[in-house]
């Protein structure tokens, strides 16, 4: 969320940022003008309200003075004035609240401002490759896709999952289920033991304000799963809605909100959290995409990393987080590349994002397995998350970062396709064998 003071002082900076975000210039200008108009109306209304409140207080005192002076006519006139003010003040308060709500709604719908170092572009085709790590393996046979391998092994069952839950679900069984669990545990162990993250086991159900804090709401309302404890489904933002929860789309949501409504001391920073959780997404805009296999599912497992830093250290932390995500792929000896997302492809809350794309031999394509984003104070403003600088100045907003470390389901896909053998069996990567009870190969029973 943006500071209206910044927009008031640098309105053209907002327009430039939105245009870089691939918003049409006339739309950006119209939005700027609407924001400034609402801001002016809000400030004028508040000024008028302050004047009425001051006059009401003064008139109340003057009534006592008039009565003491036995000036009944003046006392009566003042009482009439106070009575009118008691009507006018609530009306003006309602007006101020309505303007504030409209302004906040517009501000909440504006994406983060991209850093100048972010390449400009419309979509994924304009992303910039930073580096390629490892080499593509050569196979003496045509590599199969993960779902072909899993189904042939009798360990990956989409048909039964569809009976249970519908499309975009899977049932993994036996050693394949254990391999998926091993991947998540391996990632967690690396991040905790080698990368300095604190493991957290967060709730999977969160409230409106938690989703708002990380900017999943209101922007991505249609891509979420809501859970209702009662039968009444109320509108988003309804303050009486104490029975609705949201299934987390990523552990970024609860982990980042751990610092909501708090003032930290600078010596506590950086804070680094990690969690391995199920994640739930409606995939509302993905009709027809990746309909087979585990690439795009309604429920998947992901290890998440979240960092809370000062503004001065967030860029360095961003590169550190990327290195942590890369490290787990290097340990698995998976070929991948790193790209910088362009302005038209980066996430709503991000000011800069690095994607790691792992090579899938069966698909003959790179696919995203991690996104590492720095959000600046965009989420912190929504959460009111601040810290007190060491030099004793007033509280400042923290910077937040998040990254996949990495997506467990997609890592399973990558391991299956990379480590497949001609007979359809899967070699278990060396670093995972201790998590697999010494199993070295997964083959059909």
Swiss-Prot record:
Write out the residues that bind L-serine: 250-252, 304, 404
Localisation per UniProt entry = Cytoplasm
Sequence similarity: Belongs to the class-II aminoacyl-tRNA synthetase family. Type-1 seryl-tRNA synthetase subfamily.
What organism is recorded for this protein? Azorhizobium caulinodans (strain ATCC 43989 / DSM 5975 / JCM 20966 / LMG 6465 / NBRC 14845 / NCIMB 13405 / ORS 571)
Question: What InterPro entries does UniProt report for this protein, alphabetically?
Answer: aa-tRNA-synt_IIb (IPR002314), aa-tRNA-synth_II (IPR006195), aa-tRNA-synth_II/BPL/LPL (IPR045864), Ser-tRNA-ligase_type_1 (IPR002317), Ser-tRNA-synth_1_N (IPR015866), SerRS_1_N_sf (IPR042103), SerRS_core (IPR033729), tRNA-bd_arm (IPR010978)
Q: What is this protein called?
A: Serine--tRNA ligase
Which NCBIfam families does its entry note? Answer: serS (TIGR00414)
What EC number(s) does this enzyme carry? 6.1.1.11
The source's domain of life comes to: Bacteria
State how it assembles: Homodimer. The tRNA molecule binds across the dimer.
